[in-house]
């Protein structure tokens, strides 16, 4: 009986070890693997220019000022590159609500139209924060995809008055 048990254990160990050895992925080139992210676009905040990065560690911090003169200003010059994770600290120095939204130019136009149809709708999503006067909000963003990025305030009339900032990564 003991011999049979030892034989079963030895065979199980041999088969398990051989199977585990065949599952070695250390030599796989993961960077060359095609990955279809197109289905991820349905996730809140997903964009052609990147995605929300809650919980990620930012490698850059950008202080943003939203003002009633309809400007989006970065407090300091900053170079954002593809794959950067950026923490945006967004301050509204004005007396009216403003929005800070990240996306492509096409996405911003769609967002603007949605805001126009819904009236003065305030909301926060993975790619957008609405900031009350005198308040500050943060947005953590991972840049990837299209390298032409547009920041905008899509509250009706604001972008049309100049509250848009475009950059190229």
Curated annotation (Swiss-Prot):
One of its GO terms (molecular function) is metal ion binding. The keyword Metal-binding applies. Its main location: periplasm. Cu(2+) binds at residues 98, 153, 158, 163. It is found in: Periplasm. InterPro entries: Cu-binding_ET, Cupredoxin. It comes from the Bacteria. Residues 1-20 form the signal peptide. Induction: Induced by copper via the HTH-type transcriptional regulator CueR under aerobic and anaerobic conditions. Expressed under both aerobic and microaerobic conditions, the amount increasing with increasing copper concentration. Nevertheless, under low copper stress, expression is much lower under aerobiosis than under microaerobiosis. Disruption phenotype: Mutant shows decreased copper tolerance under aerobic growth. Keywords: Copper, Metal-binding, Periplasm, Signal. GO terms for cellular component: periplasmic space. The keyword Metal-binding applies. PANTHER family: AURACYANIN-B (PTHR38439), COPPER-RESISTANT CUPROPROTEIN COPI (PTHR38439:SF3). Belongs to the CopI family. Involved in copper tolerance. Mediates copper tolerance in aerobiosis. May also mediate tolerance under anaerobiosis. Not required for virulence or colonization in the mouse model. Restores the copper-resistant phenotype in the R.gelatinosus deletion mutant under anaerobiosis. This is Copper-resistant cuproprotein CopI. It comes from Vibrio cholerae serotype O1 (strain ATCC 39315 / El Tor Inaba N16961). The gene is copI.
């Amino acid at each position: 009986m003991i011999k049979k048990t030892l034989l079963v254990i030895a065979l199980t160990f041999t088969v398990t070890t051989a199977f585990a050895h065949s599952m070695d992925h250390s030599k796989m080139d993961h960077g060359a693997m095609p990955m279809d992210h197109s289905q991820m676009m349905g996730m809140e905040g997903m964009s052609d220019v990147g995605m929300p990065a809650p919980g990620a560690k930012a490698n850059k911090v950008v202080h943003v000022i939203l003002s009633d003169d309809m400007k989006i200003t970065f407090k300091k010059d900053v170079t954002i590159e593809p794959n950067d994770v950026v923490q945006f600290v967004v301050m509204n120095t004005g007396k009216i609500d403003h929005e800070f939204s990240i996306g492509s130019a096409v996405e911003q136009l769609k967002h603007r139209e949605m805001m126009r149809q819904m009236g003065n709708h305030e909301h926060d999503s993975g790619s957008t924060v609405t900031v009350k006067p005198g308040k500050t909000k943060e947005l953590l963003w991972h840049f990837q995809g299209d390298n032409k990025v547009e920041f905008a305030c899509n509250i009706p009339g604001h972008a049309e008055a100049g509250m848009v900032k475009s950059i190229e990564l």
